[in-house]
Amino acid sequence: MPTISLQRDDLEALIAGPDETPSRIPLDQLEQWLMLVKGELKGHNSETGELRIELQDSNRPDLWCCEGIARQIRIKQRGASISYPFFKKQQRVARKLLVAPGLDRIRPYVAACTAVGYRVTASGLTQLIQTQEKLADIFGRKRRTVSIGLYRLAPIVFPVSYDLVKPDEVRFTPLGMETVMTLREILMVHPKGVEYGGILGGHDQLPVLRDAKGQVLSFPPIINSREIGEVQIGDDQLFVEVTGTDLPMVALTLNIFAANLADRGAVVAPVEIQSPVKTAFGRRWSTPIDFGAPRTIPLKA
């Protein structure tokens, strides 16, 4: 079960919500509220304000983060669920993500959204990264089923393409490195390539995310580009994508990030996914996607 770290001030602010002044929550009260998420307080650093919380609910990955815990407590306090406008059906979605043919044999699914207006804080960035790692490692089975990429939105020119390329066809500077590398070199040299490269083993083409100018965003599920994929404190325009092998899990993971960023004050906008093959969501769909909305599923002949 996941154990997460968070800042007490950050949790209190998220429980209060954007329109209220946060107040100090006694630890004994917090421990009672954590029962709502099957959580247990494992540690508290009074000097730094850090809380360590162990979560026991393996069926609720949306609770494996500061935002999810605060959301559940807020719902209990107010007696009503939270409505997110980005789940409403959009008449027109401005930004597109195009999936190339052939990815259905390797890593077929992708979901994405943008989030604008939340200026990333130190606590917020720590939570984004922690949630990214927990979901990819536990829910995403060490990135095999789900992996997540976070980017600075401003440099990206849409439409974004989810492409297949040869291992030596594309070069970029990956996070954690100072030099430009091919995908083959990343798999051989970069620590993340060595750790996760087996996911892509046996394929003579590899997945890459690029924008309309040809700028590389990432080599999923391995590593982001350093130029675009290194979110920093103070950034207020983000692009989030999730790739994987299970479409509902990919979409759910994207939903979690969208809700978390919205809870921090971001305006989340959907991205339209265009697939060359028919999926459970069709050939075109927008994410985030409301799993509670009615949906027509064609019967097999």
What residue ranges belong to the model's regions?
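RNA/tRNA-interacting regions in translation and RNA-turnover enzymes
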Residues: 1-301
